[in-house]
Amino acid sequence: MTKLRKILIIILLAAPFLSVNAQKNAFGVPNLLKYDKQLLHFGFLVGYNQFDFLIKPQSDLSKYDSLMVINTTALSGFNLGIVTNLRMGKYFDLRFIPGLSFGDRIVNYTIQYDNGERLVNKKNIESVYMDLPLLVKFKSSRMHNVRAYVVAGAQYSLDLISAAKKKHAKTNEIVLKLYPNDFQAQVGVGFDFYCTYFKFSTELKMSFGLVNLLVKEENSFSESVTSLKSKLFQISFMFE
C-alpha cells in the first residue's frame, strides 16, 4: 500500500503540470480531430479525495453520558478507476467509471465531565470502496483543444473492509459500524484538453449519500446519532 501511495503521489503531482501544458496548447494546432466521433473509448483515472459524513445527531445529547457535541473530520484519500465512455450525441456522453476509493473519516464525540474537563473521543472509520458510478456528461462546443463539461449521475459503492472490521473488532472496544452498501448522487464539472496523443481531463466532483449507513447498536456512540450519510469531494485526473 505504501509503494502504491508513493506512485499515486508522483502522478498527482505531475498531473497539474500536464494540465498547464495542455492549456498552453489549447489554442494551437487542433489535436485528435476524429476523437469525438468515436462511439466508444477507454482510459484511466487517478484522483485525490476527501471522505466525510453528513451527520445528524440526536436533538438532545445530554442524556448520553454528558455528551455535548458530535461532529466529523474529513481526511484525505485517493481514487483509481477505469474510464468507459459511450458517445450518445454531439454534446452528450454516457460514462461508466468502475474503481476503488481509499479513505478515512473521523467522528468526534466531545464529552464534558462534572469537574468541567472536556474530552474528545475520536472514532476513526477506514474504508475501501468499490465504486460503480454511471454518469451523463454534457459537453460544451470544442474550442480548439479544450472544452468544458458537467456530469451528473448516481453511484453504488461497496465497502470492501466493512465485514473484516466487524469480525476483527476487539470485544471491549466500541466501534461505529456501517452498512457496506451505499448509494450516492453525484454532480461535477471539468475540462477536457486534447493533447497530441491522448485527451487529458481534470474534474471536480461531489458525492452525497442517499442512505443512512449507521448500524444501530446499544451504546451511546451509536444511539446519539440519528443519521450518518456519506459525503465525498474528489479531484480527478483522467487520461483517455
Specify the residue positions occupied by each region the protein language model found.
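Residues that define the transmembrane beta-barrel architecture of outer-membrane proteins
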Residues: 38-40, 74-78, 126-132, 146, ...
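Gram-negative (and chloroplast) outer-membrane scaffold detector with strong preference
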Residues: 31, 36-40, 48-54, 83-163, ...
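Predominantly the C-terminal beta-signal and adjacent terminal strand-loop region
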Residues: 180-185, 190-240
